[in-house]
C-alpha cells in the first residue's frame, strides 16, 4: 500500500497500514510500520516495525507517535496518546496510555502502564509494573520497578538505576540514589547524593556526595551541603547541615551538626560552629535564654542535693588563650594544617578567656560521691576531646550559696 493517501492518511513501506479500515490524519512510513492499525486517528509512525508492526491484534487507539526501529513495536488495542522516540523505545508497550518514552530502549519493558515519562537511553528500561514516573537521564531508573515505586522521579545519569520498590522517591543528579533497591520517601539532590544506600528510607540528601557513604538500611537522616554527612555508613535520625559537616562517627544516631567543616560531638548532641570544637550561639535578644523541661510531673525520686560548697571549692577558675587549629596535637580531630581562626572562634585569638580546664573538672567530680551520674558538667566526646558545660554548675552554685547563707545567719545569731 505504498504511496496511498486516504482521508489524510499516508502509508509508505511494505505492509504499512496494511489493515487500515477507517481513520484520518495518520502518517506511517517504514517496513511493517502500523501494519495492524485499523481504525485509529492521528497516529504517526516512522521506522521498521514501529507502531504495532510486530503484533497480530488490531490497533484502534489514536494520537500515538512512534519514531525509530521497533518503537512501539507491540502497541495494540485502544492504546492512545503515547510518544515513543528511539530504537526499541516502548517496544513492549501494548495497551498503555499517555506515556512519553524518548531514547534507545527507553521504557522498553512497559506493557500496559500509563503516564510515564522516560527520556534517555535505557531510561526506565527494566520496569513493567510502574505508573506515573518521571525518569530523565541515560540508564536512570532502569531497575525492575514494581507498583510500589509509582510516582518515582529520577533525573540524571544512573539516578535511581536499581530501584525496584520505593514510594515517594526523588533522585536528581548524576548517580543520585543509584544503588537504592527498596526504600520509601528518599530524596537525593546532587552529584552522587545518597549513591550507595540500598534499602534505607525517609532520608534527605542535598548536595554533592551528601550522605554519599550510607550503604545499608539507614533511615531518617537529613544532610544538606556538599559532602554533608559523607562519613555516615550506618547511622539514623541525624541532621547535618553545612559543607563537609559530619557526624562524630559512621554509626552515629540522633546527632545535630550545623556549620562548615563541623564534626558532631556525640549521639543526642547538637553541635554548631565553624570548623572548631568550641561552639557558641549568639542571640539577638538580651532576654533570650535556653529552657529545658523541668516539670515535677516528669520526675521521680526527687531529693535535696548535698553537693555544694565543698565541690565548688575543688574547682579552679582559670584564664587562658585558645590555640590555633594548626598548633594542637595532630592526633586531635580539631587539628587543621591551615591558618584558621582560634579554636574559640573568629576574633578570640590572643584574647584572655575565662573558664575551667576539663581534666581538672573531672578530677573534682571524681572526689565527690554525692555527684550522681546525671551530672553533666563534664563530658568526653567520641573523639576523646573533653568538654565542660558550665550551665550544669548552677544547682551546685545555688546549694553553695545556701550553705554560705546558713553560716552567715548562724554567725549573726550569736
Task: Describe each region flagged by the PLM.
Residues 293-414:
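Intramolecular chaperone/auto-protease modules of tailspike-like proteins
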Amino acid at each position: 500500500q505504498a504511496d496511498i493517501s486516504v482521508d489524510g492518511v499516508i502509508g509508505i513501506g511494505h505492509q504499512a497500514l496494511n489493515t487500515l479500515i477507517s481513520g484520518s490524519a495518520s502518517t506511517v512510513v517504514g517496513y511493517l510500520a502500523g501494519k495492524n492499525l485499523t481504525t485509529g486517528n492521528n497516529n504517526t509512525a516512522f521506522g521498521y516495525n514501529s507502531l504495532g508492526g510486530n503484533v497480530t491484534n488490531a490497533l484502534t487507539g489514536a494520537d500515538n507517535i512512534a519514531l525509530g526501529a521497533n518503537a512501539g513495536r507491540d502497541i495494540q488495542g485502544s492504546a492512545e496518546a503515547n510518544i515513543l522516540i528511539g530504537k526499541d523505545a516502548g517496544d513492549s508497550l501494548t495497551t498503555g496510555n499517555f506515556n512519553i518514552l524518548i531514547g534507545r530502549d527507553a521504557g522498553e519493558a512497559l506493557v500496559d502502564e500509563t503516564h510515564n515519562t522516560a527520556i534517555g537511553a535505557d531510561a526506565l528500561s527494566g520496569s513493567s509494573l510502574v505508573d506515573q514516573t518521571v525518569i530523565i537521564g541515560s540508564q536512570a531508573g532502569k531497575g525492575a520497578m514494581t507498583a510500589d515505586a509509582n510516582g518515582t522521579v529520577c533525573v540524571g545519569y544512573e539516578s535511581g538505576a536499581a530501584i525496584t520498590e520505593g514510594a515517594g522517591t526523588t533522585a536528581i543528579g548524576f548517580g543520585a540514589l543509584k544503588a537504592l533497591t527498596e526504600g520509601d520517601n528518599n530524596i537525593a539532590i546532587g552529584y552522587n547524593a545518597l549513591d550507595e544506600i540500598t534499602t534505607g528510607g525517609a532520608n534527605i540528601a542535598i548536595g554533592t556526595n551528601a550522605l554519599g557513604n550510607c550503604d545499608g538500611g539507614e533511615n531518617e537522616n537529613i544532610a544538606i551541603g556538599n559532602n554533608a554527612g559523607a562519613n555516615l555508613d550506618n547511622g539514623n535520625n541525624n541532621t547535618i547541615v553545612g559543607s563537609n559537616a559530619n557526624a562524630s562517627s559512621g554509626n552515629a544516631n540522633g546527632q545535630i551538626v550545623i556549620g562548615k567543616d563541623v564534626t558532631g560531638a556525640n549521639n543526642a548532641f547538637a553541635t554548631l560552629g565553624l570548623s572548631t570544637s568550641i561552639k557558641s550561639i549568639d542571640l539577638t535578644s538580651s532576654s533570650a535564654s535556653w529552657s529545658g523541661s523541668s516539670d515535677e510531673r516528669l520526675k521521680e525520686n526527687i531529693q535535696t542535693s548535698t553537693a555544694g560548697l565543698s565541690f565548688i571549692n575543688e574547682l579552679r577558675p582559670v584564664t587562658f588563650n585558645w590555640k590555633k587549629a594548626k598548633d594542637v596535637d595532630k592526633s586531635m580531630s580539631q587539628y587543621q594544617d591551615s591558618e584558621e581562626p582560634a579554636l574559640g572562634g573568629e576574633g578570640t585569638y590572643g584574647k584572655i578567656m575565662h573558664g575551667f580546664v576539663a581534666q581538672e573538672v573531672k578530677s573534682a567530680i571524681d572526689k565527690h560521691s554525692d555527684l550522681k551520674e546525671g551530672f553533666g558538667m563534664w563530658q568526653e566526646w567520641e573523639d576523646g576531646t573533653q568538654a565542660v558545660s558550665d550551665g550544669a554548675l548552677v544547682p551546685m552554685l545555688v546549694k553553695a550559696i545556701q550553705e554560705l547563707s546558713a553560716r552567715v545567719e548562724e554567725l549573726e545569731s550569736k
